[in-house]
Protein backbone atom coordinates (compact mmCIF):
# COMPACT_ATOMS: atom_id res chain seq x y z
CA UNK A 1 0.00 0.00 0.00
CA UNK A 2 1.41 3.36 -1.01
CA UNK A 3 2.04 6.19 1.44
CA UNK A 4 -0.81 8.20 -0.04
CA UNK A 5 -3.17 5.20 0.22
CA UNK A 6 -2.17 4.84 3.86
CA UNK A 7 -2.86 8.53 4.42
CA UNK A 8 -6.23 8.24 2.71
CA UNK A 9 -7.34 5.35 4.88
CA UNK A 10 -5.99 7.07 7.98
CA UNK A 11 -8.33 9.96 7.20
CA UNK A 12 -11.23 7.50 6.95
CA UNK A 13 -10.32 5.96 10.29
CA UNK A 14 -9.86 9.34 11.94
CA UNK A 15 -13.28 10.46 10.75
CA UNK A 16 -14.85 7.08 11.46
CA UNK A 17 -16.52 7.23 8.05
CA UNK A 18 -15.85 5.95 4.55
CA UNK A 19 -15.79 9.47 3.14
CA UNK A 20 -15.08 8.47 -0.47
CA UNK A 21 -17.30 5.38 -0.50
CA UNK A 22 -14.39 3.07 -1.30
CA UNK A 23 -14.95 -0.71 -0.90
CA UNK A 24 -11.52 -1.24 0.69
CA UNK A 25 -11.92 1.40 3.39
CA UNK A 26 -10.98 0.00 6.82
CA UNK A 27 -14.05 1.58 8.41
CA UNK A 28 -16.11 -1.00 6.53
CA UNK A 29 -14.61 -3.47 9.01
CA UNK A 30 -14.26 -1.38 12.16
CA UNK A 31 -15.64 1.86 13.53
CA UNK A 32 -12.78 3.31 15.55
CA UNK A 33 -9.90 5.65 14.81
CA UNK A 34 -6.29 4.89 13.89
CA UNK A 35 -3.58 4.02 16.40
CA UNK A 36 -3.35 1.89 19.50
CA UNK A 37 -5.90 3.96 21.40
CA UNK A 38 -8.42 4.04 18.57
CA UNK A 39 -10.89 1.79 20.36
CA UNK A 40 -11.38 4.09 23.35
CA UNK A 41 -14.93 5.29 23.85
CA UNK A 42 -15.44 8.76 22.44
CA UNK A 43 -17.09 11.41 24.58
CA UNK A 44 -19.69 13.82 23.31
CA UNK A 45 -18.13 16.53 21.17
CA UNK A 46 -18.50 20.20 22.05
CA UNK A 47 -19.93 22.60 19.47
CA UNK A 48 -16.35 23.52 18.59
CA UNK A 49 -15.46 19.84 18.23
CA UNK A 50 -18.41 19.21 15.91
CA UNK A 51 -17.45 22.20 13.76
CA UNK A 52 -13.78 21.17 13.69
CA UNK A 53 -14.71 17.65 12.65
CA UNK A 54 -16.90 18.96 9.82
CA UNK A 55 -14.01 21.09 8.60
CA UNK A 56 -11.50 18.24 8.82
CA UNK A 57 -13.82 15.89 6.96
CA UNK A 58 -14.45 18.32 4.10
CA UNK A 59 -10.77 19.26 3.90
CA UNK A 60 -9.81 15.58 3.98
CA UNK A 61 -12.20 14.71 1.16
CA UNK A 62 -10.32 17.00 -1.21
CA UNK A 63 -7.02 15.25 -0.60
CA UNK A 64 -6.33 16.66 2.85
CA UNK A 65 -5.28 19.98 1.35
CA UNK A 66 -3.30 22.27 3.61
CA UNK A 67 -5.06 24.37 6.23
CA UNK A 68 -3.60 27.51 4.63
CA UNK A 69 -5.05 26.64 1.23
CA UNK A 70 -8.39 25.54 2.66
CA UNK A 71 -8.77 28.71 4.73
CA UNK A 72 -7.85 30.81 1.70
CA UNK A 73 -10.67 29.11 -0.20
CA UNK A 74 -13.06 29.82 2.67
CA UNK A 75 -12.07 33.50 2.72
CA UNK A 76 -12.79 33.77 -0.99
CA UNK A 77 -16.15 32.04 -0.48
CA UNK A 78 -17.04 34.49 2.29
CA UNK A 79 -16.21 37.49 0.10
CA UNK A 80 -18.52 36.35 -2.69
CA UNK A 81 -22.19 37.19 -2.83
CA UNK A 82 -24.60 34.53 -1.66
CA UNK A 83 -24.38 31.73 0.87
CA UNK A 84 -20.81 31.17 2.06
CA UNK A 85 -21.25 27.41 2.49
CA UNK A 86 -22.60 27.06 -1.05
CA UNK A 87 -19.77 29.21 -2.37
CA UNK A 88 -17.21 27.09 -0.54
CA UNK A 89 -18.47 23.86 -2.09
CA UNK A 90 -18.57 25.46 -5.54
CA UNK A 91 -14.97 26.61 -5.23
CA UNK A 92 -13.76 23.21 -4.00
CA UNK A 93 -15.57 21.36 -6.79
CA UNK A 94 -14.06 23.77 -9.33
CA UNK A 95 -10.52 22.71 -8.43
CA UNK A 96 -8.82 20.85 -11.27
CA UNK A 97 -7.95 17.90 -9.04
CA UNK A 98 -11.63 17.58 -8.05
CA UNK A 99 -12.81 17.77 -11.68
CA UNK A 100 -10.31 15.13 -12.86
CA UNK A 101 -11.43 12.88 -9.99
CA UNK A 102 -15.15 13.48 -10.60
CA UNK A 103 -14.67 12.77 -14.33
CA UNK A 104 -13.35 9.32 -13.33
CA UNK A 105 -10.02 9.70 -15.09
CA UNK A 106 -8.38 8.53 -11.85
CA UNK A 107 -9.62 6.34 -8.97
CA UNK A 108 -8.98 8.71 -6.06
CA UNK A 109 -8.54 12.40 -5.30
CA UNK A 110 -4.98 11.62 -4.20
CA UNK A 111 -4.24 9.99 -7.56
CA UNK A 112 -5.74 13.04 -9.25
CA UNK A 113 -3.34 15.41 -7.54
CA UNK A 114 -0.35 13.27 -8.49
CA UNK A 115 -1.66 12.77 -12.04
CA UNK A 116 -1.93 16.53 -12.57
CA UNK A 117 1.40 17.23 -10.91
CA UNK A 118 3.10 14.81 -13.32
CA UNK A 119 1.76 16.73 -16.31
CA UNK A 120 -0.83 14.27 -17.65
CA UNK A 121 -3.65 16.83 -18.04
CA UNK A 122 -4.51 19.58 -20.53
CA UNK A 123 -7.00 22.36 -19.85
CA UNK A 124 -8.35 24.00 -23.00
CA UNK A 125 -5.50 22.42 -24.95
CA UNK A 126 -2.71 23.58 -22.64
CA UNK A 127 -0.76 21.40 -20.28
CA UNK A 128 -1.64 22.28 -16.69
CA UNK A 129 0.13 20.87 -13.64
CA UNK A 130 -1.46 23.03 -10.94
CA UNK A 131 -3.79 20.92 -8.79
CA UNK A 132 -5.67 23.93 -7.42
CA UNK A 133 -6.28 25.46 -10.86
CA UNK A 134 -9.81 26.91 -10.80
CA UNK A 135 -11.91 25.49 -13.61
CA UNK A 136 -14.53 27.75 -15.19
CA UNK A 137 -17.77 26.70 -16.87
CA UNK A 138 -16.93 25.64 -20.41
CA UNK A 139 -13.38 24.56 -19.63
CA UNK A 140 -12.33 21.36 -21.41
CA UNK A 141 -10.17 19.01 -19.38
CA UNK A 142 -8.38 16.26 -21.29
CA UNK A 143 -5.93 13.50 -20.50
CA UNK A 144 -2.83 14.14 -22.61
CA UNK A 145 -2.45 11.85 -25.63
CA UNK A 146 0.57 9.97 -24.31
CA UNK A 147 -1.22 9.33 -21.00
CA UNK A 148 -4.53 7.97 -22.31
CA UNK A 149 -3.38 4.35 -22.26
CA UNK A 150 -2.07 4.39 -18.70
CA UNK A 151 -3.47 1.46 -16.71
CA UNK A 152 -4.52 3.88 -13.97
CA UNK A 153 -6.79 5.73 -16.39
CA UNK A 154 -8.16 2.69 -18.23
CA UNK A 155 -9.12 0.99 -14.97
CA UNK A 156 -10.56 4.12 -13.39
CA UNK A 157 -13.13 4.85 -16.10
CA UNK A 158 -14.54 1.34 -15.50
CA UNK A 159 -15.18 1.92 -11.79
CA UNK A 160 -18.78 1.16 -10.96
CA UNK A 161 -18.71 2.57 -7.43
CA UNK A 162 -19.36 6.17 -8.48
CA UNK A 163 -20.92 8.09 -11.36
CA UNK A 164 -19.86 11.28 -13.10
CA UNK A 165 -21.98 14.16 -11.73
CA UNK A 166 -24.19 16.10 -14.12
CA UNK A 167 -22.12 19.28 -13.94
CA UNK A 168 -19.34 17.46 -15.80
CA UNK A 169 -19.75 16.01 -19.29
CA UNK A 170 -17.23 13.19 -19.65
CA UNK A 171 -16.27 11.34 -22.82
CA UNK A 172 -14.28 8.32 -21.73
CA UNK A 173 -13.49 7.26 -25.28
CA UNK A 174 -11.73 10.55 -25.95
CA UNK A 175 -10.63 10.91 -22.28
CA UNK A 176 -12.06 14.39 -22.30
CA UNK A 177 -14.47 16.24 -20.00
CA UNK A 178 -16.21 19.61 -19.97
CA UNK A 179 -16.89 21.43 -16.71
CA UNK A 180 -20.36 22.72 -17.53
CA UNK A 181 -21.26 24.70 -14.42
CA UNK A 182 -20.36 25.42 -10.82
CA UNK A 183 -22.50 23.02 -8.79
CA UNK A 184 -24.74 23.77 -5.85
CA UNK A 185 -24.09 21.81 -2.66
CA UNK A 186 -27.17 19.65 -3.33
CA UNK A 187 -25.71 18.58 -6.70
CA UNK A 188 -22.47 17.18 -5.30
CA UNK A 189 -22.45 13.38 -4.83
CA UNK A 190 -20.65 12.98 -1.52
CA UNK A 191 -20.56 9.43 -0.13
CA UNK A 192 -21.19 10.77 3.39
CA UNK A 193 -22.92 13.80 4.84
CA UNK A 194 -20.92 16.99 4.53
CA UNK A 195 -21.86 20.07 6.53
CA UNK A 196 -20.36 23.23 5.02
CA UNK A 197 -22.56 25.32 7.32
CA UNK A 198 -20.56 23.99 10.27
CA UNK A 199 -17.32 24.88 8.48
CA UNK A 200 -18.60 28.44 8.14
CA UNK A 201 -19.46 28.46 11.86
CA UNK A 202 -15.96 27.19 12.68
CA UNK A 203 -14.22 30.02 10.83
CA UNK A 204 -16.72 32.60 12.09
CA UNK A 205 -15.89 32.00 15.75
Swiss-Prot record:
Residues 94-157 form the S4 RNA-binding domain. The keyword Acetylation does not apply. This is Small ribosomal subunit protein uS4. GO terms for cellular component: small ribosomal subunit. The keyword Transcription regulation does not apply. Residues 1-46 are annotated as: Disordered. It holds the Pfam family S4. It comes from Bartonella tribocorum (strain CIP 105476 / IBS 506). One of the primary rRNA binding proteins, it binds directly to 16S rRNA where it nucleates assembly of the body of the 30S subunit. One of its GO terms (molecular function) is rRNA binding.
